[in-house]
Amino acid sequence: MIRDKNPQRVNRPSYGSISSLPSPAPQPEPSRNTYLSEKIPIPSTEQLLWVLLWATVLGLLCQRLAARLGVVTGKDLGEICHLYYPKVPRILLWLTIELAIVGSDMQEVIGTAISFNLLSAGRIPLWGGVLITIVDTFFFLFLDNYGLRKLEAFFGFLVTIMALTFGYEYVVARPSQGALLKGLFLPSCPGCGQPELLQAVGIVGAIIMPHNIYLHSALVKSREVDRTRRGDVREANMYFLTEATIALFVSFIINLFVMAVFGQAFYQQTNEEAFNICANSSLHNYAKIFPRDNNTVSVDIYQGGVILGCLFGPAALYIWAVGLLAAGQSSTMTGTYAGQFVMEGFLKLRWSRFARVLLTRSCAILPTVLVAVFRDLRDLSGLNDLLNVLQSLLLPFAVLPILTFTSMPAVMQEFANGWLSKVITSCIMALVCAINLYFVISYLPSLPHPAYFGLVALLAIGYLGLTAYLAWTCCIAHGAKFLTHSSHQRFLYGLPIEEQEGREGSG
């Protein structure tokens, strides 16, 4: 049976083959909705709704694998990466996940700054909104001191706000239900080009945050499972799968509300038309943000709130801003816990949540303040969209390790991935990697100066090299013996680095 843990956990033998190794005590669980819509993807038509649907399905598959790994082995993904990957790939992998966490926190800072700007009718400048996010950091830590239940209640409150606010926008916009269903279940995108590719990659990055895969593998450890009994392990896996399905369904509905509203409001809308709509509304002061030309409106989270207010009244703008604020606060909570688990798992370095959130927020605020002070709103909102793409680009560094270790029978025993699961997840992962690679190649010609090519080339080599290494070890774990090198037999036989080196030394 699954039950809440007592403060002191009694060590007992686990069902997974590596679970008898020492593991840090699990932390309290902040929330189980780890993939909930923390970022808002905004395409301008319903053509990409099918990307949202399948990204959510992929998110469920990833969350299922992460939970199963944690339940069976008693260890999170970061800890198992520490056991099996050599030092250099392990450090590089840790850095990529830390980059994803900082990128996610930057999005929280951007969303919060824009929401304060909208709620104050522009009286709070963007840089002021960025600095205000320091306060919400301490508010989160304040709640954390009052225990897990208070934190979960606050997270539930944020989720409710998001559902109500974005649901309100959906009702007042009244999008076409026929177009909605067609966009969801008929994968197509006629006439799409690089902007739509950017949106599609951003949707995947907004739905599946790489660090959340590491987080969810750790959260399941906050429940006591008797790993000596196969029935209890199987029951726990089903329990967490059901829980993840419910959470992702809520996430999907919230994202669907947002994307459907903007597909309705912005489809084939020109900047001139948007300017005229706002100029003839009670929010005429905002009309100047739209250039007076015939180009199609390029929607971001700031312009999105403005045009909603111009079309449906000021209430729609303020409700959008409140929903944006709630989405940002949920990101702070999950990012803090993910950062702590990742640091402890990869580096065996224990920091307090206060120190961890202070480090992450400091790294996120500096570049965001610089953009807010020296650039304009469009650059800040555009930065948010690029950060969504960054999350998608970093996704292989979470999905490839989880596919590797959940496919190793020596680690997962009878709960290792079956052949059908391996084929489906591997094909999806190959597709994601191919799309990311195509995006990187197509993005190169748009670089503002040739001097950037050298830096981008170095980053691309490092990115492709680490991805290739992770894919190689994943193939070994899937049974490709012909790829096995003597130094990496652990991925075939499930021997942690220390144990393999010990055997080689004694031999």
Swiss-Prot record:
Q: Which residues are glycosylated?
A: 280, 294
Q: Where this protein primarily resides, as one coarse class?
A: membrane
Question: Which chain regions cross the lipid bilayer?
Answer: 40-60, 124-144, 153-173, 200-220, 246-266, 306-326, 354-374, 392-412, 423-443, 452-472
Give any GO molecular function from the UniProt entry. protein homodimerization activity
Q: Keyword annotations for this protein?
A: Endosome, Glycoprotein, Ion transport, Iron, Iron transport, Lysosome, Membrane, Transmembrane, Transmembrane helix, Transport
Q: Where do Polar residues bias regions lie?
A: 8-22
**Which InterPro entries does this entry report, sorted A to Z?**
NRAMP_fam
- Topological domain spans for side Cytoplasmic: 1-39, 145-152, 221-245, 327-353, 413-422, 473-507
The identity of this protein, by name, is Natural resistance-associated macrophage protein 1
Catalysed reaction equations from the record: Zn(2+)(in) + H(+)(out) = Zn(2+)(out) + H(+)(in); Fe(2+)(in) + H(+)(out) = Fe(2+)(out) + H(+)(in); Mn(2+)(in) + H(+)(out) = Mn(2+)(out) + H(+)(in)
Q: Which family does it belong to?
A: Belongs to the NRAMP family.
Role summary: Macrophage-specific antiporter that fluxes metal ions in either direction against a proton gradient. Localized to late endosomal lysosomal membranes, delivers bivalent cations from the cytosol into these acidic compartments where they may directly affect antimicrobial activity. Involved in iron metabolism and host natural resistance to infection with intracellular parasites.
Where found? Answer: Late endosome membrane; Lysosome membrane
Q: Name one GO cellular component term.
A: lysosome
Q: Which PANTHER family match?
A: NATURAL RESISTANCE-ASSOCIATED MACROPHAGE PROTEIN 1, SOLUTE CARRIER PROTEIN FAMILY 11 MEMBER
* Extracellular face of the membrane: 61-123, 174-199, 267-305, 375-391, 444-451
Renumbered residue ranges of the record's region Disordered: 1-36
Q: What biological-process terms (Gene Ontology) are attached?
A: antigen processing and presentation of peptide antigen; cadmium ion transmembrane transport; cellular detoxification of cadmium ion; defense response to bacterium; defense response to Gram-negative bacterium; defense response to protozoan; establishment of localization in cell; inflammatory response
Give the superkingdom in one word: Eukaryota
Report membrane topology. Multi-pass membrane protein
* Name of the coding gene: Slc11a1
| Keyword Transcription regulation appears in the UniProt entry | no
